[in-house]
Amino acid sequence: RMYDTVFPKMFAGSKYAYRLPIGSMDIVDHFPYQDLRDYYEKWYRPDLQGIIVVGDIDVDQIEAKIKKIFGPIKMPQNTAERKYFPVPDNKEPIIAIAKDKEQQMNQVYVYHKHDPFPEEMKNTVGYLVYNYMTGAISSMLNTRLQELTQTATPPFINAGVEDNDFVLAKTKKAFMGVAICKD
């Protein structure tokens, strides 16, 4: 419910403003059975899935079992293209406030949007340096913020930062800071 209030402002000019990636809830609530079957056939395919195995296992045995079970699954012909939609930049700060009686804590989010690292450069030393730099900055800031929560009168209950996707958009990144406030 709170997303319904803030997303139209945060994602103004984008398809995400009024629609989550799963689609319209009206469609989810009222679809015919065949639509669900078609959705499954369209999107549940080998190139969009992964298998994770965790534990003290015999790697060769598990790998053979996975290949036996999943190997026969064929990649469909003429697959649908997975689309990511752009999120425009904004010239002025965007302020969005949402209230909900079930939200028990006040939270403040601050996003600084930026373009993602170019896909074709993700195999370069530059990308490695970029990831190291953003990770180090986030780690140092998070350490400082955590230290503040240990003081006698911290300005917030908890806080943190990260550089990641801009909420649910893959075409825009954001350096995000969040603070859970006392009041």
Question: Model regions: which residues?
Answer:
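Charge-rich, well-structured scaffold segments of protease-associated domains
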Residues: 1-80, 106-108, 114-119, 125, ...
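His/Glu-based metal-binding/catalytic segments typifying zinc-dependent metallopeptidases
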Residues: 8, 79-144, 178
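A generic structural signal for short, solvent-exposed coil/turn residues
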Residues: 43, 88-90, 100-102, 151, ...
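Conserved catalytic alpha/beta cores of large enzymes that bind or transform nucleotide phosphates
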Residues: 145, 150-151
